[in-house]
């Protein structure tokens, strides 16, 4: 059960970048996890690329 919980947490980390990158389904799950780390760095720096991904994510939530 502990392994399943840990796997569920990593799935959340993978799903979030997938929601932000709906058009880029070609990205494998491993790259999705790495992209999560890059996204956090972009949030700290406030790059325009990161802000451009937010509207795409909102579309997915709608």
Swiss-Prot record:
One of its GO terms (molecular function) is type 1 melanin-concentrating hormone receptor binding. One of its GO terms (biological process) is chemical synaptic transmission. GO terms for cellular component: synapse. Signal peptide: none annotated. It comes from the Eukaryota. Residues 60-62 are annotated as: Melanin-concentrating hormone-like. Residues 28-62 are annotated as: Disordered. Residues 23-41 are annotated as: NGE-like. Residues 44-56 are annotated as: NEI-like. Belongs to the melanin-concentrating hormone family. This is Pro-MCH variant. It comes from Hylobates lar.
């Amino acid at each position: 059960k502990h392994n399943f919980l840990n796997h569920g947490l990593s799935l959340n980390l993978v799903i979030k970048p997938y929601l932000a990158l709906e058009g880029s389904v070609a990205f494998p799950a491993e790259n999705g996890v790495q992209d999560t780390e890059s996204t956090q760095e972009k949030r700290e720096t406030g790059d325009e690329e990161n802000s451009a991904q937010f509207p795409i994510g909102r579309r997915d939530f709608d």
